[in-house]
UniProtKB/Swiss-Prot annotation:
Keywords: Polyamine biosynthesis, Transport
Quaternary context: Interacts with ODC1 and thereby sterically blocks ODC homodimerization. Forms a ternary complex with PSMB4 and OAZ1 before PSMB4 is incorporated into the 20S proteasome. Interacts with AZIN2; this interaction disrupts the interaction between the antizyme and ODC1. Interacts with FAM171A1.
GO molecular function, one term: ornithine decarboxylase inhibitor activity
Family from the record: Belongs to the ODC antizyme family.
Free-text function comment from the UniProt entry: Ornithine decarboxylase (ODC) antizyme protein that negatively regulates ODC activity and intracellular polyamine biosynthesis and uptake in response to increased intracellular polyamine levels. Binds to ODC monomers, inhibiting the assembly of the functional ODC homodimer, and targets the monomers for ubiquitin-independent proteolytic destruction by the 26S proteasome. Triggers ODC degradation by inducing the exposure of a cryptic proteasome-interacting surface of ODC. Stabilizes AZIN2 by interfering with its ubiquitination.
Protein name: Ornithine decarboxylase antizyme 1
Disulfide bridge positions per record: none
Pfam families: ODC_AZ
Zinc-finger found in the keyword field: no
InterPro entries: Acyl_CoA_acyltransferase, ODC_AZ, ODC_AZ_sf
Biological process annotations from GO: negative regulation of polyamine transmembrane transport; polyamine biosynthetic process; polyamine metabolic process; positive regulation of intracellular protein transport; positive regulation of protein catabolic process; viral translational frameshifting
Length: 227
């Protein structure tokens, strides 16, 4: 069901722009520009960091409580260096792995919320990593700022298949700021893929008037039904 929709990604407007992005590194880490999800591992994100870039998650209302305003040390960029910074990879455990995806889970203080790093292998020299939160049957993905990383079209397709087949997710949410210059293009692209705009006040997303949420509902066939 998802697979047929995912074929549309190959010719979608936004993903066609991906080659305009930064090609200086063979490994592309979407998490570098996604503070909303990358600040979660201790169950909180600082007020200061939540105002940087997306600013999607602070003082949450109903929905997955994947971050709060409790200050803590900043996130260390995966594979990077720095003093007094945290590196999630040191404590992450492998949740799922095949020839296309390597999914690791980071420990959190909330047993109902899981922080995932989903790495998609496109070629031997190229990988794309998405940061996500898995909570209450929904997978929440924060889109990186700027043009989507090169290879995103194939990587995102594999991610949605993983959500449906391995996580048995009910919904996949994406989040990005309303003031993005490419907002209209993102809305067209993901609407074409079957995503719908989430109306304000929806119980499954935080109250963020400055953020846009879209949802893909994964419908399953009743095993008792026959054609």
């Amino acid at each position: 069901m998802v697979k047929s929709s995912l074929q549309r990604i190959l010719n979608s407007h936004c993903f066609a722009r991906e080659k305009e992005g930064d090609k200086r590194s063979a490994t592309l880490h979407a998490s570098r520009t996604m503070p909303l999800l990358s600040q979660h591992s201790r169950g909180g994100c600082s007020s200061e960091s939540s105002r940087v870039a997306l600013n999607c998650c602070s003082n949450l209302g109903p929905g997955p409580r994947w971050c709060s305003d409790v200050p803590h040390p900043p996130l260390k960029i995966p594979g990077g260096r720095g003093n007094s910074q945290r590196d999630h990879s040191l404590s992450a455990s492998i949740l799922y792995s095949d020839e296309r995806l390597n999914v690791t889970e980071e420990p959190t203080s909330n047993d109902k919320t899981r922080v995932l790093s989903i790495q998609s292998t496109l070629t031997e020299a190229k990988q794309v990593t998405w940061r996500a939160v898995w909570s209450g049957g929904g997978l929440y993905i924060e889109l990186p700022a700027g043009p989507l990383p090169e290879g995103s079209k194939d990587s995102f397709a594999a991610l949605l298949e993983f959500a449906e087949e391995q996580l048995q997710a009910d919904h996949v949410f994406i989040c990005f700021p309303k003031n993005r210059e490419d907002r209209a293009a993102l809305l067209r692209t993901f609407s074409f893929l079957g995503f719908e705009i989430v109306r304000p006040g929806h119980p499954l997303v935080p109250k963020r008037p400055d953020a846009c949420f879209m949802v893909y509902t994964l419908e399953r066939e009743d095993p008792g039904e026959e054609d």
